Structure formats: structure tokens, C-alpha cells
Amino acid sequence: MNDAFAGLPYRPCVGVMLVNSQGRVFVGRRIDDKDGVAWQMPQGGIDDGEELHPAALRELSEETGVAAELVTIIAESREEHLYDLPDELIGKLWGGQYRGQRQKWLLLRFAGEDTDIRLDAHDPAEFSEWRWVEPEQLPDLIVPFKRRVYRQVVDEFRDLI
């Protein structure tokens, strides 16, 4: 990381690992992905004064259309997970105010049907397509700078999935 960015803070964020009854995990392909490599689980910033669980349910609803009554919160990560953006993205995302994200992750069990997932529930949409994948597949689908965090989240939640 460029020393000019090292003093920037991390953006407070919540991540959601949504699992179905078969133990598969939701991933969405980012709508701005041109290369087919930017898949991710739902995640987003925590607003000032917002608590973790409501932030997770809000992000889930905005990005997937999944209503709160269709999920059960199973677990919360023991610690926050940090990642740094590549230097070339720091000035382009979040107004250049953050060096990366500080994420707390929640594991949620999905009790709905696939038809309850609506990527067009929020404008603008976050994802262009989605699928269920095995937890072990996640890190290989994710942009390289987030892979370490995804491995940590999979390892932490593996026995609960």
C-alpha cells in the first residue's frame, strides 16, 4: 500500500453469509464486473448510529430483496476482519476517505424460496446475477484483495453451516 493511504481509516461494514437449507452460500456477481471475477456475498457500510444486525438485514434486503422474516441469524463473527483496497481503487471508492473495510460478518439461514431473491429490489442494483455455491468455492470466486477475509469467514462459520 502506498504510504499516502496508510493513515486513512477503514470503513465500518457488515457482511452477510446467507446459507440455504442445503448448506450452500449465496454469491452475487457485481453489476459493475466486466471480467466475471467480482462475485461477493452481500455486504455494505454501517450507517452512523446503526446497529450491526439491522445493518445486515438492510444490506441483505437492498442487495437481494430477501425480507428479514425469511432469515434467521445464526452467528456473528468473533472479531472484525480487515482488508485494504488496491492503491488504484482507493481514490475511486467511498470518496477516497477509506483505505479498505473493517467488516463484522453474520451467518444467516435462508428459509425462503429462490423466487424470494430479487436483485432488482433496489435501484441501483448491486448484482447482475446470483447463485448458490459450496462454502469452499467462495475464495476462488472473489477478487484477490478480499480472499483472505473470505477464507477466514468460511473457516469461522464452517461448522455452523
Curated annotation (Swiss-Prot):
It comes from the Bacteria. The keyword Hydrolase applies. Disulfide bonds: none annotated. GO terms for molecular function: bis(5'-adenosyl)-pentaphosphatase activity; guanosine-3',5'-bis(diphosphate) 3'-diphosphatase activity. Its EC number is 3.6.1.-. Transmembrane segments: none annotated. Keywords: Hydrolase. One of its GO terms (biological process) is ribose phosphate metabolic process. Residues 9-155 form the Nudix hydrolase domain. The keyword Ubl conjugation does not apply. InterPro entries: Nudix_hydrolase, NUDIX_hydrolase-like_dom_sf, NUDIX_hydrolase_CS, NUDIX_hydrolase_dom, RppH. It holds the Pfam family NUDIX. A motif (Nudix box) lies at residues 44-65. Its cofactor is a divalent metal cation. PANTHER family: NUDIX HYDROLASE 26, CHLOROPLASTIC, UDP/ADP-SUGAR PYROPHOSPHATASE. Accelerates the degradation of transcripts by removing pyrophosphate from the 5'-end of triphosphorylated RNA, leading to a more labile monophosphorylated state that can stimulate subsequent ribonuclease cleavage. Belongs to the Nudix hydrolase family. RppH subfamily. This is RNA pyrophosphohydrolase. It comes from Novosphingobium aromaticivorans (strain ATCC 700278 / DSM 12444 / CCUG 56034 / CIP 105152 / NBRC 16084 / F199).
